[in-house]
Regions:
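Flexible, glycine-rich active-site loops centered on histidine and acidic residues
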Residues: 103-151
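N-terminal amphipathic alpha-helix/helix-capping segment at the start of soluble metabolic enzymes
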Residues: 2-38, 45, 49, 53
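Alpha-helix-loop-beta-strand connector modules within alpha/beta enzyme cores
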Residues: 73-96, 141-165
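Glycine-rich, proline-tolerant flexible connector loops at the mouths of alpha/beta enzymes
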Residues: 42-46, 59, 63-80, 129-141
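Structural motif corresponding to the early beta-alpha repeats
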Residues: 91-107
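Acidic (Asp/Glu)-rich catalytic clusters
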Residues: 26-31, 55-60, 80-90, 111-119
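Hydrophobic faces of well-ordered beta-strands that scaffold small-molecule active sites
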Residues: 36-40, 63-67, 93-97, 122-124, ...
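Short, acidic/polar
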Residues: 45-58, 78-79, 104-111
Length: 165
């Protein structure tokens, strides 16, 4: 199913001074149009072609692709790597960052790495429980997704270089 780009009364939303995101997802949202995103589960391999093959399925149907972060409590290619690969191919991307099983330094690294690779959209999540995964282990929850969201905003806006202290 394809969605038509129809403007909504009261849109487009103004762009704030100093803001320079030309992203497709942002353009759709600012127009007030219905935005469609989908999740892409990263492969268990290091082969970029596995990522591109999965993304091509959604060509012409979605406004952005969410790269999941350790979905199902399993190990996959990182969300940062998937976003970097897809951005090079021109896809609009949303980097998911899960706070499950990561300490603050790992979360900081993901957010800063994503920003360095051109990621403009982040979805902060608690993450799937480890009981869903394929390895026997105990889950670790260092931070809440809301706290991570608050802190990631400051990093992505360039107002803070160290987060979640």
């Amino acid at each position: 199913m394809k969605f038509e780009d129809e403007p909504v009364p009261g849109y487009p939303l103004p762009i704030l001074p100093g803001h320079t995101s030309p992203g497709r997802l942002e353009r759709v949202l600012r127009r007030g149009a219905f935005a469609v995103t989908t999740e892409l589960d990263p492969p268990d391999s290091a082969d970029p072609e596995d990522v591109f093959r999965r993304a091509r399925i959604f060509d012409g149907y979605v406004d952005a692709i969410n790269a999941t972060d350790g979905s199902g409590g399993n190990c996959h290619m990182s969300s940062v790597a998937v976003c970097a690969l897809l951005a090079r191919k021109g896809y609009a991307i949303v980097m998911q960052v899960s706070c499950r099983d990561k300490n603050r330094i790992a979360i900081q690294g993901d957010i800063l790495g994503g920003a360095a690779m051109g990621v403009a959209n982040i979805l902060c999540l608690s993450g799937d429980g480890v009981q869903a995964g394929d390895q026997p282990r105990k889950g670790v929850q260092i931070s809440s997704s809301f706290r991570m969201w608050q802190e990631s905003r400051t990093v992505m806006n360039g107002t803070k270089t160290s987060i979640m202290q």
